[in-house]
Amino acid sequence: IVYGFLQFDRSVGQTKQTLFTLGLMLLFLIPKFLIVVPLLLEDFYRLGKGIFNYVQHKPTPTFLPERRRFISQVALGLAAIPFGSLIYGMTKGKYNFKVIKQTVFFDDLPEAFNGFKIIQISDVHSGSFDNKEKIEYAIDLINQQEADMMLFTGDIVNSLASEMHPWIDTFRKIKSFSYGKYAVLGNHDYGEYLDWKGNKNAKAQNFEEIKQLYG
């Protein structure tokens, strides 16, 4: 983890190495936090009880009562939940594509829009991809919806237009829609999370290339 952070360079952007390092850090810290909190609360209780026994002159083998095994087991159980979830998210979860269907009703909706279907996708973050087969499955899933219109609501990359280059041919397999495809830029598409070392021309060129990806 330390090596990963030492190697982090904002001028390079979010590489697979930096994302992996971030995942390891969360994997290390979040479960540890869930272990520490209940144990720390129990320690406050033990300290209070120890002080109470001391003030009351109650004879005890030790000043602090022994830690209860049940509390330790509960803490470990709590820590196992995010640990398992993070492992799943880092390996399988990012490709767990799902279709969520939502029927929208409007009293004043023209009859011509009855049954009109819009498919909306978002936050592709192509720089995080490493499995072509899974992405092709996602494209097939989009095409299977038989929608009338497609909306893409931003973040096609993490920062750099080049992140999308290996996936352009795959995304071109998205079929045409009767009422077209529409998109807006996301916050990551502006390249603001990258250190451009003051090179405004490179930043502007990258932004133009990202806009062309949307074309």
Label for each model-derived stretch:
Residues 25, 74, 103-108, 125:
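Short, well-ordered turn and helix-capping elements at secondary-structure junctions
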Residues 7, 14-17, 56, 73, ...:
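Residue-identity detector for glutamine
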Residues 2-5, 59-62, 90-99, 122-130, ...:
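Short, mixed-charge, low-aromatic patches
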Residues 52, 84-119, 129-133, 140:
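C-terminal segment of N-terminal export signals and the immediately downstream linker at the start
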Residues 1-95:
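Non-catalytic terminal accessory segments
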Residues 109-215:
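Soluble catalytic domains of enzymes that build or remodel membrane lipids, polysaccharides, and related
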Residues 12, 16, 58, 85-92, ...:
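Short, flexible coil/linker segments at or flanking structured domains
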